Amino acid sequence: MGIAHRKQRKQQIGVSKQQDNLYFVWLDEFHKVQSICLNGQQKDIFSHLLPYLPQKTNQCCFIGAISPHLTWSKTLILPQTLNAQECEQQCRFILQKELPIPLDELWFDYLTTPLKQGFRLDITAIRKESANAELAKYLPLKLTALDLLNHSILRAFYAILGQEPTNALFLYQDQQGCLAVCERLQQRQVLQSQSDLSELYQQFIQRFPETIEQIYVYQTPDILNSRTIELLPQDWLRIETDLPFIALGNALWQTDLKLVDLSSKTTALLTPSNRERGDVKP
C-alpha cells in the first residue's frame, strides 16, 4: 500500500478515528454525503457497517489521513509538463538525492499542477514503518490508502464552502493540536502546532509573510464545548458542520468537489462572535 494508489477507483469511504469511535463518510450514487459513527472496538464492525454502504465491502476502499509531521515533502517548479512515468522518475531521483533512506523503506506519492508557465510537482514520502504504525490504529479495519491530513482538511473546507478561495488561510483544531494550511500558486504552505489557533496564526505569518485575504476556522465539537475555548478575531470565519470533518475530507479524495451534494447536512459559516447567537453569515 502506498500513500495513495491513483489507479484505485472503487467506492471511497473516508475514515477518521477519535478515541474508540470510527467515523465513516461516503458519497451515495447521487453524490449525496452519507455518514455513520461506530464503536471501533467492536469485533464484528463490518456487520454493523455493511447495511449502510452503497456497495459490498470488497468493492470499497477505506481512506485515512496521516499527520504531515510524519512525512517529508518537497515542491518543484519545472519548465515543462511531465507524464506519469516522468513524474515517478523525478520523484525517485529527488528522494534518492535528498533522503538518507533506501527507497524500499519508503512510500511516496506526488501531485501535479499545471501552471501558466511551467509545471508544479509536489512530492510526499513517508517511512513504511511510520505508515504501518498509523494503519495499526484502525485495526481491525484495514485502510486502503493514507492521504495527508492537510490535503483532507482543504477538501473538507472547499466542499463546505462550495468554492476554493485563493490566498485564504485555513485553520483546523482538535484535541491533538492545530494545523494551518494555505494553497498558493507556487506551493502549499503547512504549519502544525500544539499551541492555540492565535499563536499558530502568528507563527504562520512570520514564516510565510505573503498576503492572506481571508481566514477560515474549523474546531471539533469537543474543542467548541470546552470551557477554555479561546476568543478568535472578529474577521475570522468559523465553519461548523454535523459531519466528521476529517472523514469528510478523506471521502473526497480524488473527487470532483463540484459534484458533492451537502444539501441534506447541516453546515454553517459564522463569525466567532456570532456563534452563540447562531447568526449565519451569508
What are these regions (language model features)?
Residues M1-P282:
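Hydrophobic/aromatic-enriched cytosolic interaction surfaces used to assemble or bind macromolecules
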